[in-house]
Amino acid sequence: MTTTSLEAILKEKGNPVQLLRNSRIGMYVYPVVAPEFSNWRTEQWAWRNSAVLFDQSHHMDELIVEGPQAAEFLSHHGINSFANFDLNRAKHYVPVTPAGHVIGDHIIFREREDKFVLVGRAPTSNWLLFCAAYGKWNVRIKHDPRSPSRPEGERVLRTHYRFQIQGPEANKIFEKMNRGPIPDIKFFHVDWINIGSKKVQALRHGMSGAPGLEIWGPYEDKSYILNAILDAAKEAGVDLVRCGSRAYSTNTLESGWIPSPLPGIYTGDGMVAEYRKWLGADSYEASGTIGGSFVSDNIEDYYVNPFELGYDFYIGWKKDDFVGKDALVKMKGQTNRKKVTFEWNPEDVLKVIASAFEDGTPYKWIDFPQPNYASSSADRIEKDGKMVGMSMFNGYSFNERRVLSLGVVDADVQIGDVLTLKWGEAEPTQKTSTEQHKQAEIRVRVSDTPYSSEARENYADSWRTKK
């Protein structure tokens, strides 16, 4: 990629934790799409109560993988079973390192026997691009990287537009767009529907936990498709709310997907060491940030495995071999952490916010609706002063009237337990996304994933009885 590699930077800087905790790349940006079309509260409300339109055209990488060995290549480098991966289906694709550490994830679509489309964040794209060359596979890969974070007025073009319509009134819009009932598309299956004069592919999907379709097509059709969707919503009498990038980043909180685990590639020999030599100094992996109250000298303490994220049911154990299989077999017999939702105590959140209006050093600011200030977040979750978990992605839900975060806890932690989240960093770093601050302790109640208001109400007394 470039003459200076991630491996060279690590040799120069030493500990990868210090490299990433002091990166000055700044806040993660969802590019091009306006921050708000109305206001982020109304936009969050819409995916629960009416219908919302997400523009997903710019913030994700896209890979088109085709060729005689396309299926074999992707199966070998992902944990997923490909046994039932028929045409016009999609999967949540998860690659791991030979040591079993999660690298990232993509949504993968099978368009032909020998052609797949994958969309998602950079770590998985980078890994697959490397693996295609490293293993001398007979595949062709077209890489369309995400749009620039700060295009500075330059025109931005992509291979495909990508929209998602979700919410309880979404079907009314679909029927109006399609000029009649849409096909009965099963979850994570794909079919064709009409939008105006165009036939487009539609995936049954729902990122925020509400029913919906994800649609895509040639980028040059984007304006036409957008206007056709808005016209159909108007004809259907549905108040379709366009969602900006501020609210979009929080939609995963209610559905339970952790979007940005730290790629587990900073340690390891063999192909992972070669990968670090291949990755450039400008890559996501070299320039991204770690933020939060959890600090360890061992970068592997920030890694997660598929069992911890709830992805173990994806694993294709019957496959002859795939990268990481031996390591996952060993992990399967061990006790692993589990994914949960943390519900932040409102009084403690207000205490943190109030400190910004007081003299002296405030607590770390909680931005709304998205307080994350690093590419990968890692906040300590404690019980009686002992670390029992890690909060990895947080935000405010107007629908639930709560700050929530997603993360992992030790296996013996129970739903309903009230723990302590350490908010803010104990020592200053060079990150441009943090101000001078002090740490706060925030009580968090362990909740199910996906999170639901019914679960919160069942434990309503816990905030009053547990201090």
Model region roles, listed by residue range:
Residues 59-66, 97, 107-109, 116-121:
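Short secondary-structure transition/capping motifs
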Residues 1-92, 101, 339:
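Acidic, proline/glycine-enriched N-terminal capping motif
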Residues 84-86, 95-101, 106-112, 154-155:
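Short, charge-rich binding segments
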Residues 74-76, 104-107, 119-120, 128-131:
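Short, conserved acidic/polar surface loops in the N-terminal third of protein domains
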Residues 43-49, 95-105, 194-203, 388-391:
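Short amphipathic beta-strand starts and helix->beta connectors
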Residues 1-35, 112-467:
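Conserved, structured C-terminal
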